[in-house]
Swiss-Prot record:
GO cellular component, one term: cytosol
UniProt keyword list: Cytoplasm, Elongation factor, GTP-binding, Hydrolase, Magnesium, Metal-binding, Nucleotide-binding, Protein biosynthesis
Residues given in the record as Mg(2+) binding sites: T26
G5, as annotated region: 176-178
GO MF annotations, alphabetized: GTP binding; GTPase activity; translation elongation factor activity
Catalysis performed (reactions): GTP + H2O = GDP + phosphate + H(+)
InterPro entries, A to Z: EF-Tu_GTP-bd, EF-Tu_GTPase, EFTu-like_2, EFTU_2, P-loop_NTPase, Small_GTP-bd, T_Tr_GTP-bd_dom, Transl_B-barrel_sf
Region (G1): 19-26
Secreted recorded as keyword: no
Protein name (database record): Elongation factor Tu
Purpose of the protein: GTP hydrolase that promotes the GTP-dependent binding of aminoacyl-tRNA to the A-site of ribosomes during protein biosynthesis.
Subcellular location: Cytoplasm
Length: 396
């Protein structure tokens, strides 16, 4: 069947759910689709569909591992929504998922209040540059005491402020995602309030349309008879059919031509900043491109191994290391969708870095990746985030 052309009528915004495991992120995503589908603004999807790629834990729960993309509309906008994994082990995916957000919906269970991963996700949202967080206080139907809800709300505001979000004025919507799925009026009303909140609170992103095209590769697959498709979110610029592009990072830079562009299984003649697209690349083998490389306008970005960076090392209370590290420390660095091992070299006269410190260091990666000044990254070790940083200068 011929694919429908994608209609651009409303402004397009990327959002996503973040928060602690079992606080209701995926249930909220399902409830938004359920409520909006009743108005003809979304296609309904079940919890199990959204949590696809999850590993089943018991009869009712799925640990959401895969980042799941869904789409829906409000009265004003078209949203692409990523359901981000909440489990601590999968923060790595959270880093690639949160990178796709113009704003985040932080889901907090009223019964539990903020938990360790709530904190970690807010920090990561700050590091990957999510500009605005709207809060959905979920499961309020389980709490009879309004004072308790006020306390939880206060705690959330303090936490947002701690990580440089506007906690004082943050929009906090109280509701029950399950009640919304079941079609209960108070459940649906909360989802409507949330839709209004994301419409007004999450700024329409200043798309970086005029900059040279760049997309970080998230996934690669081959389509029989057509060639290799690379998927990801266009970070900046515009790509059109038959544009020449470069594949940069992890191996020698190569050049190719874009022979197809699609979004949500519909064909486009161009993709622009903020779109999640698949690009069909001429003459590229499935093995010729991998996650973590970038596809970019020719000569617009180059691969580098060495840089200076300002880093913040999480304190023990924030879930970071308990002990200092020394010159020559070798963690993983997460850039866009790439994880690369590298070495941290401390400034002269500095013997060690303590948890809670922030400091300027030199980093050297084992593979060259597409890198530029002001780019953010996370520092990971043994499956958890221990710090975050920003490139201040490219060395070589």
């Amino acid at each position: 069947m011929a694919k429908a052309a994608f209609q651009r009528t409303k402004p397009h915004v990327n959002v996503g759910t973040i928060g602690h495991i079992d606080h209701g992120k995926t249930t909220l995503t399902a409830s938004i689709l359920a409520v909006q589908s009743r108005k003809g603004l979304a296609e309904i999807k079940s919890y199990a569909d959204i949590a696809k790629g999850g590993t089943v834990r018991d009869a009712t729960k799925t640990v959401t591992i895969a980042v799941s993309h869904v789409e829906y509309e409000s009265d004003k906008r078209h949203y692409a929504h990523v359901d981000c994994p909440g489990h601590a082990d999968f923060v790595k995916n959270m880093i690639t998922g949160a990178a796709q957000m113009d704003g985040a919906i932080l889901v907090v269970s009223a019964a539990d209040g903020p938990m360790p991963q709530t904190r970690e996700h807010i920090l990561l949202a700050r590091q990957v540059g999510v500009p605005k967080i709207v809060v959905f206080l979920n499961k309020v139907d389980l709490i009879d005491d309004k004072d308790l809800l006020d306390l939880v709300e206060e705690e959330i505001r303090d936490l947002l402020t701690k990580y440089q979000f506007d906690g004082k004025n943050a929009k906090i919507v109280r509701g029950s995602a399950t009640a919304a799925i079941e079609g209960k009026p108070e459940g649906e009303a909360a989802i409507q309030e949330l839709m209004n909140a994301i419409d007004t609170e999450i700024p329409e992103p200043a798309r970086e349309m005029d900059k040279p095209f760049l997309m970080s590769v998230e996934d690669v697959f081959s389509i029989t008879g057509r060639g290799t498709v690379a998927t990801g979110r266009i970070e900046r610029g515009v790509v059109k059919l038959n544009d020449t592009v470069e594949i940069v990072g992890l191996r020698d830079t190569s050049s190719t031509v874009v022979t197809g562009i699609e979004m949500f299984r519909k064909l486009l003649d161009r993709g622009q900043a903020g779109d999640n697209v698949g690009l069909l690349l001429r003459g590229v083998d499935k093995d010729g491109i991998e996650r973590g490389q970038v596809i970019a306008a020719p000569k617009s970005i180059t691969p580098h191994k060495k840089a200076k960076a300002e880093i913040y090392v999480l304190s023990k209370d924030e879930g970071g290391r308990h002990t200092p590290f020394f010159n020559g420390y070798r963690p993983q660095f997460y850039f866009r969708t790439t994880d690369v091992t590298g070495v941290v070299n401390l400034p002269q006269g500095v013997e060690m870095i303590m948890p809670g410190d922030n400091i300027s260091v030199d980093i050297e990666l084992i593979s060259a990746i597409a890198m530029e000044k002001t780019q953010r990254f996370a520092i990971r070790e043994g499956g958890r985030t221990i710090g975050a940083g920003r490139i201040t200068e490219i060395v070589e």
